[in-house]
A protein has these predicted regions:
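Short, well-ordered alpha-helical segments enriched in acidic and aromatic residues
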Residues: 27-41
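Short, charge-rich amphipathic alpha-helical segments embedded
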Residues: 43-55
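Surface-exposed, charged secondary-structure patches
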Residues: 52-101, 112-116
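Short, low-complexity N-terminal intrinsically disordered segments enriched in polar/charged residues
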Residues: 1-28
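A common structural junction motif
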Residues: 103-106
Length: 116
């Protein structure tokens, strides 16, 4: 699958179910669900114990609202970074979500995901 030539709106359509799953799985502290769409490279860095520690100590990543707004794409090399406006159920304000997508084995996979 070729994603680099897709429009921002087409990328948003690809990113929405992936980010949706990350939000739901993070709120549930579900490691298997959270890592479902990860690339092989991301899986090596996604230690279940470390993720568990983050979930235990961080209200931001366990109380995310399931509504979000993608607002931009950055293309670099073989990856596209989707910028997402995210809100939280307990912490006021808006947060920046970053979802890095690429292709592995002809499937769109997560090569990076953060929220600030």
């Amino acid at each position: 699958m070729e994603i680099l030539s897709k429009s921002d709106d087409e990328i948003y359509e690809l990113a929405k179910p992936i980010w949706d799953n990350l939000v739901k799985s993070s709120n549930l502290k579900d490691y298997g669900g959270f890592t479902r769409d990860f690339s092989t490279q991301m899986l090596f860095g996604a230690n279940e114990v470390e993720l568990g520690k983050q979930w235990a100590n961080n209200k931001l990543i366990t109380n995310l609202k399931e509504t979000f707004e993608p607002f931009g794409c950055l293309r670099r090399g073989d990856h596209i970074t989707v910028l997402i406006k995210q809100t939280n159920k307990e912490i006021p304000g808006e947060f920046l979500g970053r979802l890095v997508l690429g292709v592995e084995d002809n499937m769109v996979k997560v090569f990076g995901a953060t929220i600030y």
